[in-house]
Amino acid sequence: MPSIQKQRRIIDRAALVGELDALIAGDRTPQEARGGFLDLLKGAMEQGRAEVRSRFDAGEANGEEVAVALSFLADQIVRLIYDFATDHVYPAANPTEGERLCVAAVGGYGRGELAPHSDIDLLFVLPYKETARQEQVIEYTLYMLWDLKLKVGHATRSIDECVRLARSDLTIRTAMLESRYLWGDRKLYNELRRRFYSEVADTSGPEFVEGKLAERDARHTKLGGSRYVLEPNIKEGKGGLRDLQTLYWIAKYLYKVDEVANLVDRGVLTKKEAHRFDRAHRFLWDVRCHLHYLAGRGEDRLTFDVQSEIAALLVYRDRAGARGVERFMKHYYLIAKEIGDLTRIFCAALEAEHQRKPRFRLPSIGLFHKSIDGFEVEGGRLNVRSGSEFRDDPVKILRLFHTAQEEQLDIHPKALRAITRNLHAVDQIRDDPEANRLFTEMLTSKNDPETTLRRLNEASVFGRFVPDFGRVVAQMQHDMYHVYTVDEHTVFAIGILRGIEEGSYGDEMPISSEVVHKIQSRRALYVSVLLHDIAKGRGGDHSELGADIALELCPRFGLSHEETETVAWLVRYHLLMSNTAFRRDINDPQTITDFCAVVQSVERLRLLLVLTAADIRAVGPNVWNAWKAALLRDLYEAAEERLTGGHAAGGRDARIEYAKEEMRALLADLPPSAIDAHIARGYPSYWLSFDADTHAWHARIAHEVESRSEPLTIKNRVDRFKGVTEITIYADDHPGLFSRIAGAMAVSGANIVDAKIFTMADGMALDTFWVQDENGEPFDRADKLARLYARIDQTLAGRLRPREELKKDDGVSSRMRVFKVAPRVLIDNEASRTHTVIEVNGRDRKGLLYDLTRALSSLNLQIASAHISTFGEAAVDVFYVKDVFGLQVTHDSRLNQIRDTLLAVMVQDSDAGADRARPPGDSGTSVAAEVSAAE
């Protein structure tokens, strides 16, 4: 426990007692003096808190010292009030035995730690049943504390009640365990402590340990089950202060120690481990105090909006490839992981002393063997006879995990403790062929590789054996898209890949689940998933840097030259398929030509598809959806056809004629003249952009419009397989039509994910929009569709102005505003032979597509298609456009005008000017290059 420097500058109780004596001197009664006493205490509290805050802000006190100082301040306030109550308000010249009273601090306050805005918890201890005077003193004390605006938790119990309740209630038992004498009758408190240990704690060690660990597990489950959540609760979350406190409670309960350092003397922890405990405790208290002071209340969630502020306060500066806030959060996650290590070590020590039972018993044939591969089997868990085995034969560390995987056994905490204490030995076996064989077999095993890799990572073996992986352990990206740290995402992706192989994702990923069994380079696929993000956080293009790392690591892992080249290629181009599918027009022949020029073989295409699917699915909940699956499937099928010698760009005329004949075959019930009329309407690009079923649907819509002479027709059909609602609008074409429709859809809450816009030969506009609701599901509720139809009609008639409606709410949450996304506009005339491709990156908001298309319309550009993607707070919108003459835009001045106009649209909503803030991706690269669905 840190000592408090210059205590009297925080609060001088002796001086306050003197002022109090002066206050009640003369004829004033204690009741009359209460107001002055209260003012005196308020002033002392304010001055004391200000002094502590000043020390913290100036770096003269750390978080632990703040907690101890604030506890000291509260102690003096409680003592002053108690003394005033017993000496002046309700004095007793000769109190009886039964009127004795003691005040104890419990909870965090009992440990002598008080955060800036935490409650103080008090236990009023009685020898017997409560007397009238005791009730009056307690009531006076509490009311004074409440009048001081303190949050007070309290209980009044006799010693017998305390002991009885502690036996039956784990929470009360814990409160009793960490209680601290505060004021009043010390003998009474000592008697309580004696009886608590003799009648409760001394006889219930294993029960208490199991109860607290079960309580911890339930708490972890409630708060997400991972220490790597984006906005962790530093008190209650996994790897937080409460986990450290749980270890402290167990140690105090079993060993009767008051300091973690005492566990070194008991042989439970080494000096180094006790130092790690203290370091973690100090860091978490620093963060917690900053949180409370910034929030101005008792806040323990490390939310997005304060992460950057605390990172700055703790002087985490930006470095190449990592922002200061990312470095801060990485440190936090590493501390949380270290707390997990300490927990395992501690539990192993407890079990060694038979203080607790094994918590897991996994059924396996291995249970009936005394030993397997040189390891002991104890209660279904692999153990070592001596921790020195790992020091003498470090390869045995990897063999332990390999055997556990093959035999489906858990690993004994004692073995994990021995590994932790011999981690340095792993350095010696990085180039050992046997160690690398074991590692590669674990990675590519059909027996739950995800769990094994997670065990290796939790035990810190993974990052030690593969230092490049160690660099991304706890590496996070400060945005709303990447849910997991890089190491968690990677391990999760391996699990997804194995699930694809097993058929667990047949409904979600049907093509990947089919293709994966045709792949010949299975080892290369698994290693590429392992290494695809290995270079994140280094600055530069992590795909290129990762490919270089793959060339170094793969031979070490035992891969052949051919496999190594394949892995390096997959890592280099692991974003290619998602970027192409989500940001390019797959129906444009140039898209497939460019894509196939890089892929070159069907085997690589299959590998890339499965890698992409596993990568996206492992980004976070709800990132993978039916629409993305459909886009990837369409790209895969088009590329496969091209790579296997199917129709190429040169067969364009033949494909157009084939599309027309396919449509005609589906329209036997329509008059031939109606079919011929629709064929005459469509330009060549139209026939290459939809399947026969959609062409037939369009023909029926056009025929219906002609027969009824309606100026506007809106039709929809729900595509459950793609997870979208397809909305087709047939109307007289005019400039800005797309923009107005996009505005009406934004006002209606429909999110456009794709769009194709055609002006037919007869001057009619045939615009198709694929839309979803706010949850990424088809926009299919009847009431919402009716409202959407009405708003489109009102907008096109000039009765509704989307711009005015959208000004009322831009849909950007306060959490989203925390993130700065640099606006960028990229213009490409090589991605298509017929269109100029414009890619706009920036922060997403409601109505963004409306504003962008409105700007494009003002520039007299014709939009042929739009492809919309969002990545958390970031939007990537791609438009295929032509000028008023139906040509690509090529003149530099015109291109600069387009870029400046679109940047102005993005900058008006951005906290940073163009190119000032790094987009979600690696330093120095554009969102277009880096923010992909798979990153």
Question: Can you name each region flagged by the protein language model?
Answer:
Residues 283-284, 323-382, 451, 459, ...:
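Regulatory modules associated with amino-acid/nitrogen control
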Residues 98-104, 110-114, 118-120, 362-385, ...:
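Active-site-adjacent "gating/activation" loops or surface patches in catalytic cores
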Residues 111-137, 265, 277-279, 283-285, ...:
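Divalent metal-dependent catalytic cores for phosphoryl transfer on phosphate-bearing substrates
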Residues 86-99, 155, 412-415, 455, ...:
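Acidic/histidine metal-binding catalytic segments
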Residues 1-105, 112-114, 118-482, 551:
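Non-catalytic interface/linker regions that flank or bridge core catalytic/transmembrane domains
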Residues 83, 87, 499-514, 533-536, ...:
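Conserved helix-loop functional segments at active or binding sites
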Residues 71-89, 93, 492-503, 736, ...:
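A short, contiguous, amphipathic alpha-helix enriched in charged residues
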